[in-house]
C-alpha cells in the first residue's frame, strides 16, 4: 500500500487554488464531473477517442486526457500528467477495473478521494463478508462449496463485473452445468470458478442504498436508493410462465441500467442504522474507514427485514439515477444534490479547513 505520507507529500507540491477533479470516462463520471464543476473545480476526464462524445456533448470536462486503452491509466506518464494538473482522482468501479486493484494500492501515486485501502474489501468476498457480518448486518448464509448446496443459491464472482456471470441454482449438478456453459461462452475462466462465492438465495424486493460518510462531520448521510434493470432476468419475467418453461433459458443478471425508488418511511430507521453500523466497523477494520460514498445492496423480505448481499466501498453505478438530486439528498439542503456534487463539497470544505488529509489517500 502506498504510504499516506507519500500521497500527502505529493499533494503538498500542488497549487491548492488549481485543484482538478479527475475520473475515468465511464460508470458515474458524468455526475462526478458535473458536481465538481458546480462547486467551482476544474475537471478532467480520462478517455479513449472513441468514447469521448458524452463528455463533449454534456460539457462536463474542461480537459481531456486521451489514452489508447483504459488500462494505460496506470502508466507513469499518465500519472505525471495528472500530478501536473493538481489532480484528485475520484475512483469508481470502472477506474478500479481498468487500473487494477494492485496498481491502485501500490503504484498509482496520485491523490485519491476516499480510503484506497478499503477497495479490496469490496472486491474480495471473504473480506466483504467479514466487514458486513462484523457490522451486525443480516447477510445471506454462505456455502463452503458446490457440494454443500442444499437449496436455492446465488453464485457470484469477485470484482466489479456488473453481475456478469452470476447465476442461481439449486443442486451441485446444476452448478457444474451452468459453470460449463459460462466457460464455453467465455464469460467465466477457471480462475473465476475457483473464486466462486455461493450464498443463500434471498427472496425479496431489491434496494441499492447509497450513503455518504463525511469524515469532516463524522456523519452518515442517506443520498438515494435505486433498483437495477438486469438482462436477461427482467426480460424473462415479462414472458408468461408456460412460455418460460418452453424457452428453457437460464436467466443472467447483467446490469444494464438503474431506476430510482423510495423505500417505505418506516424502514428508514433500519436504513440509517445499517449505514451507521458499517461506517463504525470500517473505522475499526480498515482505518480510517469508509470515507465518502458507499452502497449497501439489499433485499427486503416479507418480514420487512433488509438483508445485505453486497456492498460498494466507493461511488456505485446506481447514483446515476439522481444526477439532479434524489428525494432524500434534497432534504439536507432543500436543493438538488447529486453524489458527485456531494463529493466535491467535501473536498472543497476539506481544502478550506486545511483538512484535506482527512479525505484523500
Swiss-Prot record:
This is 5-formaminoimidazole-4-carboxamide-1-(beta)-D-ribofuranosyl 5'-monophosphate synthetase. It is an enzyme of class 6 (ligase). Gene3D superfamilies: 3.40.50.20, ATP-grasp fold, A domain, ATP-grasp fold, B domain. Binds 1 Mg(2+) or Mn(2+) ion per subunit. Pathway: Purine metabolism; IMP biosynthesis via de novo pathway; 5-formamido-1-(5-phospho-D-ribosyl)imidazole-4-carboxamide from 5-amino-1-(5-phospho-D-ribosyl)imidazole-4-carboxamide (formate route): step 1/1. The gene is purP. ATP binds at residues 146-208, 230. Its EC number is 6.3.4.23.
